[in-house]
Amino acid sequence: MQQDFEAANPDIKLEFVTIPSQYADTMVTKLAGGEIPDVMMLAMDQVPRYALNGMLLPLDDLASQEYKDALYPVVKDALTVNGTMYAAARDVTPKVMYLNTKMFEDAGIEIPADTWTMDEFVEIAKQLTKGSGADAQWGYYWANWTDQTFAMIAAFGGELYSEDGKASVLSTDENTQKAVQFMYDLYNTYKVCPSATQAAQFGDSEFAPFMANKVAMQLGALSTASTFDANGTEYTVLPMPYVDGVSKTSSFVNTWVIPKTARNPELSWRVVEFLSGKEGQQIALDMNYGLPASTMVDTTEFEAKTPYNKYFVQALETAVPYPTNLNGSEFQNMFQKECESLWAGAVSPEEFAQRVDEQAAPILSK
């Protein structure tokens, strides 16, 4: 990517700087201290935090209308805060369902059609959950990360936050309530998921149980395929199971932003324009960073590489963006802690929803 950019822009030399950990908080400190990069990468859930604290340059006057019009709808939502564009897309990563084909084959279970329903998903998960001790295996697993959990909420058409972002809606939104009940049932009624402790015995990666052929189905993104390929894992991909006739999932967008106090915004935009434009997006796709955020990029060759790559692209049509909030980080910490109690069956779905909403009120209304 660097070589391609510098060849097209010989007057600009790029220097990539890596932040080893705590990226979002570290960059806030650097910006406050006057250590200003020309361009930054920023996850979509951090864009509101930076934008509303006056740290980002608005891009509406820099980005062409052609660029904006070519963005997938799910991407447009991730780049704007209160109607103003503050970020350009690096890539977009919708969640899809990975299936461990070795486990399916060993159990004599056929890979379902790409129109499979959530009921079919549950029945398959039950069939693939068996054994005990060292011989135990499970039908499904997801790590307790809010983006993984929200993907299942999105499948049922649910939400995390109210429209104004000042409250959570787990106890008031009917579709979200259905999703919470379903996730509770996966652990406590159907018992098709390993606990976090059981999953951890296979390794630190959230996909370690899948790669150990101990979990048969798990949500992942495009980059997950690279992880499985490197491990030699046998897998295929299907869309999110259908609920009420629709396959819906969530999507996460990685972005490029320009600090408000960047030395030369015009030069910074030239970098961002390339990285988020047709050529840069194509490079990101070729390297399996994620899907292109723009319809300007031809995905025909990518879709032809495997029988299932088309499902990544198709997911963008119905995907909803991972919800962002200025106080999202504090909310997520609380939410994940409460999810632990729900998965363990220590609280009912109704109690869980009420507890989350009660704790969310003072967090989100700040």
PLM regions and their residue ranges:
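Periplasmic solute-binding protein
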Residues: 50-55, 75-112, 142-165, 251-257, ...
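Conserved N-terminal structural module of periplasmic/extracytoplasmic solute-binding proteins
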Residues: 1-52, 65-69, 93, 111, ...
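Short, solvent-exposed loop/beta-turn-alpha elements that line the ligand-binding surface or hinge
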Residues: 60-71, 113-114, 131-134, 138-139, ...
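Hinge/lid segment of periplasmic solute-binding proteins
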Residues: 44-96, 119, 236-238, 300-310
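A structural signal for short loop-to-beta-strand junctions that line the ligand-binding cleft
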Residues: 29-30, 37-38, 68-103, 136-142, ...
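Glycine-centered hinge/linker elements that transmit conformational signals in sensory
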Residues: 125, 166-197
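Bilobed periplasmic-binding protein/Venus flytrap-like ligand-binding cleft at the lobe interface
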Residues: 215-216, 254-290
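Long, aromatic- and glycine/proline-rich binding clefts that accommodate carbohydrate-like moieties
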Residues: 78, 235, 285-337, 341
